[in-house]
Structures are given as structure tokens and as C-alpha cells.
Amino acid sequence: MSEEELNNRDTESKQEHDENNSNFEAGSAHMNLPVLPLREVIFFPGDYLPIFIGRKGSIQAMDKALAETSENTGRMLLIAQKNPKKEIPEGKDLYEVGVIAKIAEPKINLQDGGVKLMVIVECRARAVNFRKSEGVLEADVLPIEEEESDNVDIEAYRRAVVQNFEKCVKLSETIPDEIIGLLSQIDSTSRIADLVTASINLKLSVKQEILETVDLLERIKKVHALLEKELGVLQVKQQIKEKTESQIKKSHKVYLLNEQLKAITKELYDKEGEEYDELVDLEKKIGNGKLSAEAKEKVSKELKKLKNMVPMSAEATVVRNYVDWIISLPWKKKGKMITDIAASERILKASHYGIEKVKERIIEYLAVQNRTKSFKGSILCLLGPPGVGKTSLASAIAEATGRPFVRMSLGGIKDESEIKGHRRTYIGAMPGKIIQHMKKAKLSNPVFLLDEIDKMSSDFRSDPAFALLEVLDPEQNAHFVDHYLEVEYDLSDVMFVATANSLNMIPALLDRLEIIRLEAYSEEEKLQIAEHYLIGKLQREHGLKKSEWSISKEALKLLIRRYTRESGVRNLKRELANLMRKAVKKLGVQSGLKSIEVSVKNLKKYAGVEKYTFGTAEPENLVGMTTGLAYTQTGGDLIMIEAVLLPGKGEIRSTGKLGEVMQESVQAAYSFVCSNCNKFGFTSKFFKSKDVHLHVPEGATSKDGPSAGVAICTSIVSVMTGIPVRSNVAMTGEVSLRGKVMEIGGLKEKLLAAVRGGIKIVLIPASNEKDLENIPKSVKNAVRIIPVSTVSEALTFTLAEQPTPLAVDVWPDIPLSSTQQSEQRV
């Protein structure tokens, strides 16, 4: 249906209403009408408009009005609420004056359960008495009679109101222009006053005041005053709009709206003498902060730039974020540190068992710093296998010094920007993780843990390890520049601590670190850690009392041996937690059960099938079977090296998934034995007629390294001479072609494996004798350790009997090829 047809329909409906209700007159006696409370809206006499009803009480009032059979059929009292938030208003919640409205058209039910009505507002009315009838709010209503007057003052105000209203319509963007034509057709001064009041932007209470003003002269005066004020507001708004439009392009709509907001804000603040609180607050923070001179100058320029920007623009957001980052950093804001070295030592000893050398080195480091009041020096790097307490030790250092602790994981980082940030030209740019963690620390002197420093990766674009050089150099980190900040930030008060599992780092970075090695825990150390640290902590976490759960020392040893294989205690902690979970469940299910004790007998019941086996000494001496010692990421272990003799041409082949270094070690050992065969009791002719097959069991496991050289030599000599190898002897050491036994690593872990495997004698390189000082006494007391310098010396301990040397043997002549002969002639 077209708009013209709708207007004709509305006009016909209104005319029909006027004809059918000509007998209704304002000022007649009281009438009883249902009340329809209005929220945030005021209607005036003469309005013909839709209303939407949603509240249950209002719908009931409408239904009652439609059900009325008297001359008031379809009539209701529309009256505004004093508090629009009141959901079910009573009489006291409504104003006294409202309007009588007539339902002009059949109601339309809406999908949301509400109702749409077209009503004609007939006259003002006063509610004399409110009451409820059958759940519907009703009122005794007295229509208010309004009289027109030819008073000269009224006519003067009328003309002024019409003139000013026309100006408002031209300036306003919300009042339609068509209303001016409608105003010219109205003769009633009362209707003009009501129409103007309904059209301009006024508070609900002001419109209610106009509705309650019956005296026409007083009402037209009030409307004139309100219109004058509204006209002034619209004129100022127009001035602001014109001023804004002269500064920007007309096509930039978003920019226009932002500038209008800026101009309005400036107009208000200039008139009231106020300042923009947020920018002033930033200025105060810059002035009161301990920023460096360079940072203060830079951020002041950025703040000045921010004041001249559009608040909602993208560039303003970037600048604001930058200013916030600069202000939020701890510039020279230091925390109070613990200077009592004895107290620091107690904290370290209470937090970690064993590792006395490590704790002693840390205390020395702290003592020097306290005395010199300088933090320039070596950067500590805690090196050790997983689970030995590197990260927790760094946290304990923070506690021992009274500094805040922040941890930055470097594992997998492959972009330099992760360390030094992105430049602000990039979208979404942020500072690097160094600056981010300094903000998190809130102080300029935290303990800063660089975790897994050896796990950084690189690509063809950049290597983040080089970005760390500036951070970890005590001579440079006082002038660290993040790409995002673009100003120097002092990191010289930060105590950097790094952790690593290996030394696979660039030499320049490694040169800046002081390596402190944390070796694998011995079985005794694991036992002590479990008893004094892990069990109590896990009992608290699982809500178990000491009297409710316990584990015997023998069961704990078995748990360590058969259910874990690691250098540290992480898996041991998991296994203990598993035992406690099962205990908590059992105590909850069996009400009569008061406590559970885990012993060797019932350990399998709670922990399940044994997960690991470890190498053990052979029960008897065997030919070609040698016990070696290996070092892995999970600690030490025994490896069995087998050799058999086969008819052949004097060759050796090796199996067992050996790495390149270990294969070269096999070749070196074979060459040494071959070149010294007469010393070991067999001839070169015999040697050339046999092949040796060397095998290292557990073929699915990769093996590499040179430290099995002594064991390989022993197996080859044993199989060549037929002399058995002592099963209670294990050995480790690299072998040269001259039969020298050279230094190896992982001595502590290898000795722990030997003790665990029931070995009685361990041969080590003589050059490793100095490392025995760091071996626990319990280990040295459990096994006999013999340093050896040569293979011949080692064979005196490994073979069940010594071979009888032969006279100097002459190797058979081997015919030269034609090429070799020509080369020899040349």
C-alpha cells in the first residue's frame, strides 16, 4: 500500500471517529477508564499515532477498553510513569495529568507477543483516584477543558513560537520539513504549543510540565522559552559543523564525524574551563615517572602529536599504545633485595637437596654482587638434563635475593623480533619479549630466567641467538634498544639466568655464559628428594595426612629403579602422584580403611607392571661379551658389546644401529688390535683368515659416541684369543690408534649405572681421575674405580687370564696392483 493511500486511510478513520464521538466533550463529569502507563514518552491532544504495548497489565487495560459497552468504548487514560524502570507501576508511580485516547483501528498482534494500536488523543485529563479492578489499573478521570483566547499577548507569543520553530526545523536534522506545512494549517494556539513541544528534543519531565500547564498564556510562554533555548543549541551546533567542514574533505564521512565530536568537546571544555583528564593524566605520569631523558623527550613528542589527532583514528590508537608502553615500564624502579648471604644460603638449601657445588657457586656469585653493589659480571647458565631442577633453582635464586621472578621460554623461537620487538610501522607491532617481561616484573631488577636457551631455532632470515648477545653482554645491556620503543632501556640491574640441556649454541653466545653443570641425581639423592620434598608436597596437594599414606624405603627404591628412567625426578613425582590418587580413591570407597602403606609386596598392585629394566652384570664370564657404560639424556646405563669370530678375510662388521662416531670407534679399535696382534697372542695370518662380527644389543635404539672404545677392544681381543671377559667389570674410555685411553664425559651418570647394575669394578680413563672429586661418596664406596691409561693396562683387569705374547710377527706380503706399482716407481 502506498504512502498516499495510508494517509487517506488515516484521514478517513479520523473523520469517522469525530462523527461517532461528537457527543464526547472535555470538562464533562468524571468517567472511569482503564489506565495505560507510558514509559519515556508523552502524548498531546490531537496526536494520531501508533503505540506498541508489551506489558501484560497494559494489554489487559487495552482489552478492557475494547470490551467496554458504554460511550467510552475503546477509550483509555494514557499517563506517564515517574520512574520508567518500574515494571508494574501503581497509582503513586504515575503523574496526575495525562491524556484520554481513543483506539482508532483494530489491534495488530505482533510476533513477540505485543500489540500495535492506532490511537487518537482527544484531550488532557486529570486522574482523580487510582484503583485496581480485576487486576487492571483504573482511574476516575476528569477531562480538562481548554479554551481558546484572542488575548494580544497570546497571539504575539504564538507568532514568535511559529517563527522560531521554523528556524529550528531548518537547522535540525531530526525534525521533518513537512511539519512546517502542517503548522500553517492549525488555527488553535493550544494545538500549536503542544505540537512544538512534542517535536523538539526535551526531557520527559519538561514535556510533562507543559502537558500539566492548562492556562494557555502560561503554556505558550513556557514553550517560547524552551524553543529559544533549543534554537540557541542548534545554532551553536551549526557553527561547529561549519567550522569542522572547512577543515576536512566533504567526502570523508568518518573523519567528518570524528572532527565534529572533537569540535563539540573543545567548545564545551573551552566554555567551562575544563581539561581533557586522560591526556592530563598521561602528562602527570610522564612528569612523575623515572624515565630516562631520552625516553621522556621521545614520549613527550608523541603525546603532543596525540593531542592533535582524531581520538578514534587508527594512528591515534598506535601512538596511544606506544605512550602507554613507555609509561608502564619500570624505569629505574628497583625493589629491596636481601643482602644477608646466610639467609640466602638457607633459602637455597631448603628449596633443593644436594647439588652443593652448584649452590656454593650461586652463593659466591651473590656475595660478590652484594659487596660490589654492581651487577655486571657473568651470566649464569644452568646446564643439565631434564628434570634436575634448573628452572626451580632459578626461582629459588629470586627468592633468596628478594627479587621478583620472570620466566621467558626460548624454546622454538626463530625470529629476532620475538626478542627485540617489531618496528611501529607494522600493523599490530609490539615490543619484544624482553620488554614485555620487564613490564610484567614491575621492577627494574628482577631475576630474569631465559629458559631452554639452547632450543632456539633459526632460518635464512634471522637467528634470535644473535639478538640475545646485546641482552647478555654486561657492557651493552645498559643500552638495550627495542625496535618498538626506539629508545634505550637499561637492563644492567637485571640478574639473567639461563637454562640449557646442551651446549649447542653459537660460540659468541656461549662465551657470555658461565656454565654451572647440574648432573643427574644418584639413586640415593632421588630417595632423599622424594622423602624430604616430593612426598610431603604431593600429600598436601592430594589432601592426604601423613598418617593416611606412607611408602617404605625399599618400595621407594624399587619405584625409582623399575618405574622411572631419568636424570631428574619428574617421572618419580608422577609415579608418586599416581600412587596417592589410587590411595585417595581407595580410602574414599572403603569406609573402614584408615591408612595405606605401600611396600615392596603391594607396589605392583598400585603402580602397575614394572616399566623399565636396567643393564645388569652377566652372571658368568663369557668370550667376546664386554660390559660398557653409556651416557644418555635420561642418565647412565650399561651396554653389552658382543663379538663372534667367523671365517673370512680379516674384516669387521658392526650392527646394532651404531652412529657414525661409534662406527669409527669400532674401526679404530679393530686397527689397534690388528696392528698389535702379536702382543695379544695370535698371528697376523690367523687375523687375516677371520672376520669379526661386533653387535650391540637393543638394535632399535640409536647409539653413538667414542667412549666404548676400550670395551670394543676388549671384545675383539677376547674373541680372537678365546679368553673370557670378567662379567663384574665395566669400562668406559675412548681409544686412539696407539692404544691410549682418552677422556670421556658423563662419568657420574655412568658410575651410577654401574652401581645399579651390580658391577664391582669400573675402569675409567686416567685423565678422568680428577672428576672423582664430584662423585658422591656412596657411589665411590659401592664400586672399585680403577683409572687406566692404555688398552693393555685395561686388559689386565678385564680378561679372566692374560694372553701370552708371541714373537714379532711379520705381515705377509700383499701383491701390489699395476697402479700402485707405477706410483711406487715414480
UniProtKB/Swiss-Prot annotation:
Annotated compartments: Cytoplasm
Keyword flag Protease: yes
Residues at which ATP binds: 384-391
Zinc recorded as keyword: no
The protein's Enzyme Commission number: 3.4.21.53
Domain Lon N-terminal: from-to ranges: 33-231
GO CC terms of this entry: cytoplasm
Catalyzed chemical reaction(s): Hydrolysis of proteins in presence of ATP
GO biological process, one term: protein quality control for misfolded or incompletely synthesized proteins
Region (Disordered): 1-27
Up-regulation conditions: By heat shock.
HAMAP family: lon_bact (MF_01973)
InterPro entries: AAA+_ATPase, ATPase_AAA_core, Lon_bac, Lon_bac/euk-typ, Lon_lid, Lon_proteolytic, Lon_Prtase, Lon_prtase_N
Biased composition (Basic and acidic residues): 1-20
GO MF term list: ATP binding; ATP hydrolysis activity; ATP-dependent peptidase activity; sequence-specific DNA binding; serine-type endopeptidase activity
Gene from which this protein is expressed: lon
EC primary class: hydrolase
Entry keywords, A to Z: ATP-binding, Cytoplasm, Hydrolase, Nucleotide-binding, Protease, Serine protease, Stress response
Protein name (database record): Lon protease
Lon proteolytic domain segment(s): 620-801
Residues of the active site: 707, 750
Family: Belongs to the peptidase S16 family.
Quaternary context: Homohexamer. Organized in a ring with a central cavity.
Pfam families: AAA, Lon_C, Lon_lid, LON_substr_bdg
Organism: Neorickettsia sennetsu (strain ATCC VR-367 / Miyayama) (Ehrlichia sennetsu)
Matching Gene3D superfamilies: 1.10.8.60, 1.20.5.5270, 1.20.58.1480, 3.30.230.10, LON domain-like, P-loop containing nucleotide triphosphate hydrolases
Summary of the function given for this chain in its UniProt record: ATP-dependent serine protease that mediates the selective degradation of mutant and abnormal proteins as well as certain short-lived regulatory proteins. Required for cellular homeostasis and for survival from DNA damage and developmental changes induced by stress. Degrades polypeptides processively to yield small peptide fragments that are 5 to 10 amino acids long. Binds to DNA in a double-stranded, site-specific manner.
